[in-house]
Amino acid sequence: YDPISGDYSIRLDANESFLELPIELLEKAQYAMADIAFNRYPDPNATELCESFGAYYGIDPALVTAGNGSDEWLFIITSSFLMRGDKILTVEPDFSMYRFYGFLAEAESVVYQKKEDLTIDVDALIAAVNESGAKVVLFSNPCNPTSLGLCREEVRKLITSVSALVVLDEAYMDFWDQSLLGEVAQYDNLIILRTCSKAFGMAAVRLGFAVANPKLTQTLRAVKSPYNVNSVSQKIGALVMNEQEVLHQALDEIILSRKALQISLKELESKYPDQLYVYDSCTNFVLVRMPRAKEVFEGLLERGIAVRFMGDTLRITAGSAEENAQLLKNLESLLSSSTNP
């Protein structure tokens, strides 16, 4: 995974929230810093933070363990539950870091290839898991980068049909309604990952959570570093998650932005049917297939707009109304220039 570097006026490449935290909330965070004993190590259990997470989602905080973004959990889980030569099954396309962490654990990679329309045949996936003898299954739902998701019933079927540990990355589930967080305690082979980087607008803070039944949670807490989440991140994360009304309003605004962006991109698809295909989305971004994806990507960069280039597709984060308008204006300019040389 190679993040885009450089100074671009419009950043629609990393699926961050386009909304900054309200100034009132930032002022509360500033005052909260006075409560931190900077000469002391942080709470090893991130108790206040996990309680705020539990209150926000309506789950038992005893099932929640905090980490430095989901990336820390991906490393911890793959290095703790896999031994050299064990098999990890991932799906393609999906978040590229999953296979990378499996590689670091010296696990054997097994790949389930999605259908041509980028959806998952859950029965075929179950067969692939069981036939391969995979010890860990790791995938995102909804999926990054496809913007598509598996419904709750299909994920349940997967979990109950395999003996492998299912690691379900729900980084984008705040934008959909098919989470299994409320059921996680029922399963002895499920770990759900959540993040503060997307819907909550706290990408800079780097907070991620692993949610699992009591036995798995005990294991996760045993293998993580004792003081892994610093006191500043704990304090800010708890403070923000306690502001449920603010977060819900922001979430509504992000979803409206994505829907508007998707509608506008679909209009461009109707106008230039040979140049782009727009996928459905249950996330905060839209995936667009384009035969000239690289050329368009570079053209947008030249105009100060960063999106994510992924082979024959572009992944476009929903931005503010102004950012979306600039993207669409420049995108149409690039599309029309090829049809009218």
Predicted segments with their positions:
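PLP-dependent aminotransferase-like
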Residues: 80-139
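PLP-dependent aminotransferase class I/II
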Residues: 22, 189-268, 278
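Short acidic capping loops at alpha-helix termini that bridge into adjacent secondary structure
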Residues: 60-64, 85-87, 170, 188-189
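PLP-dependent enzyme catalytic core of the Aspartate aminotransferase-like
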Residues: 153, 294, 299-308, 312-341
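N-terminal "arm"/small-domain region of PLP-dependent enzymes with the aminotransferase-like
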Residues: 1-40, 132-133
